[in-house]
Amino acid sequence: EKKLLSKLDYKDGFSLYVGIPFCPSVCSYCSFSSSPIAEWKDKVESYLFALLKEIRAIGKMSEGHRPDSVYIGGGTPTTLEAEQMDRLLKTITENFDLSNVLEFTVEAGRPDSITEEKLAVIRKYPVTRISINPQTMQQKTLDLVGRNHTVAQTKDAFYLARKLGFDNINMDLIAGLPGEDASDMEDTLRQVEEMHPDSLTVHALAIKRAARYGQEGR
């Protein structure tokens, strides 16, 4: 991070964040603004139309400036279909000068939203980093918090990304998930270590009012 920070253009640079507010399911601990993709499938095209229009407008407004970083988050960006992801990335690359970008991240957070076709689309563009986020490698916990995917899917998605040439893969974990103890976290770390991600981000569980757990008073 220090190496990247030293290269930032604090005068003319900026960071570009693009949000995709859809997920395969909404985790019970999550307070982010996101909705289940199945319930909003017929609205995704309308959202994408408005988003691409905004990206073009911001591109014109920022002429003379170059982004230092690009981050596509959410939600889960890979809930978009491959063709929709292609349009999104194409619009970004056409409307911004990316020659100064130090890091271009696409969150591929939910393994159950990752396909070979979507990863192949991402590889077409100057994306330098993806994030595949199991949060835990304990199946009992995944089921409890409503993530609706398996540990095996996490591993399959990770190794598929490696096979397609992704050489900067982050993984996110959450410490303190409901029902987990130190031995569960130790086992999760062991399994992740065996996969050799390029970076690991560990968050402490924080229940906020917007999360289902927060509304239930847990």
Q: For each predicted feature, which ranges?
A:
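Conserved non-cysteine loop/helix-boundary elements of the Radical SAM core domain that shape
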Residues: S34-R218
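N-terminal [4Fe-4S]-dependent radical SAM core
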Residues: E1-L16
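Canonical Radical SAM [4Fe-4S] cluster-binding loop centered on the CxxxCxxC motif
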Residues: G13-S46
